Amino acid sequence: MRILVFQTNIDSKHHIETVQTIFNDHSHILDWSIDIEDIDNVLRIEATHHLHEADVMHLVSQYGFNCEDLVG
């Protein structure tokens, strides 16, 4: 298992609902959360080793949101 951590501009419950389906239905995402009370709107993903940071950034950007790797 891998832990991936990102800074996003997903800053409301409505925005979370927008991406919820893609995260819940993704076969390599085991669990995820977005902290909209954090200044960085942190997206934390528990994933299999098959999911990479670039995959998540691409997925999120398809929905019009910004997503940057926080751990680097």
Regions found by a protein language model. Name each.
Residues 39-44:
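Surface-exposed aromatic
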Residues 36-38, 49:
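A generic beta-sheet turn/junction motif
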Residues 34-35, 71:
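Short loop/turn and capping residues at structural boundaries
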